[in-house]
């Protein structure tokens, strides 16, 4: 479970405070990027996770950044979260933030078929920019509170996640459903990936017993 302090740079949005005096210092920093098509609720998910606040009316995001210090699986972590633009006119910015990200929350809306089609393209772009066959990604079907308007079957989204080896969550920023869980799973995926990417430690040189010149007894 996540807990901790948060702050944000989004314009006209509530801000959190810094870490309290009793909070343990974070032992790691992760750069997380929230990506997806326009209007899928990326900002709503991010702000709900950062500040436990649902924003229903705001201008389309160009790019906002937030910081949250929290504990995931008992390990303090600083999360630098970039909430990105979904509008096509800002597409040129994508590769820049993709290069910097340690992990990606890939978001579509369950009531928007086109947004689901878009995540496949974004996933492919992430792997191309990173020049990897896999990378830490969590797939999120947002707006689960709009079940009656669903256009993307849960089974189809789950199959996408399974075939690409990424976790899938159906979430609702409005109801705060699976919001923390999705971000926490992304942190776990980043940790696992980084552990696998670390070069093996060089073997330590064997210690010689004794020292100095050999003694000769006369």
UniProtKB/Swiss-Prot annotation:
A motif (Effector region) lies at residues 58-66. It is found in: Cell membrane. It comes from the Eukaryota. GO terms for molecular function: GDP binding; GTP binding; GTPase activity; protein-containing complex binding. Residues 216-218 form a propeptide. Residues 1-30 are annotated as: Disordered. A lipid is attached at residue 215 (S-geranylgeranyl cysteine). This is Ras-related protein R-Ras. The lineage of its organism: Eukaryota, Metazoa, Chordata, Craniata, Vertebrata. The gene is RRAS.
């Amino acid at each position: 479970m996540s807990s901790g302090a948060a702050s944000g740079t989004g314009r006209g949005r509530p801000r959190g405070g810094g870490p309290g005096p009793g909070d343990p210092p974070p032992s790691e920093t992760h750069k997380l990027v929230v990506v997806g098509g326009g209007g899928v609720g990326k900002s709503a998910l991010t702000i709900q996770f950062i500040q436990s606040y649902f924003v229903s009316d705001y201008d389309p995001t160009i790019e906002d950044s937030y910081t949250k210090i929290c504990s995931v699986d008992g390990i303090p972590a600083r999360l630098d979260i970039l909430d990105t633009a979904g509008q096509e006119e800002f597409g040129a910015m994508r590769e820049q933030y993709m290069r910097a990200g340690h992990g990606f929350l890939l978001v579509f809306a369950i009531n928007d078929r086109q947004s689901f089609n878009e995540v496949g393209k974004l996933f492919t772009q992430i792997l191309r920019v990173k020049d990897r066959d896999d990378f830490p990604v969590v797939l999120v079907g947002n707006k689960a509170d709009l079940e009656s308007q669903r256009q993307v079957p849960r089974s189809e989204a789950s199959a996408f996640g399974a075939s690409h080896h990424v976790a899938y969550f159906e979430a609702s920023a409005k109801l705060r459903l699976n919001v923390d869980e999705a971000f926490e799973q992304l942190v776990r995926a980043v940790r696992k990936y980084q552990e696998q990417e670390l070069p093996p430690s060089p073997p330590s040189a064997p210690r010689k017993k004794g020292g100095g010149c050999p003694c000769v007894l006369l």
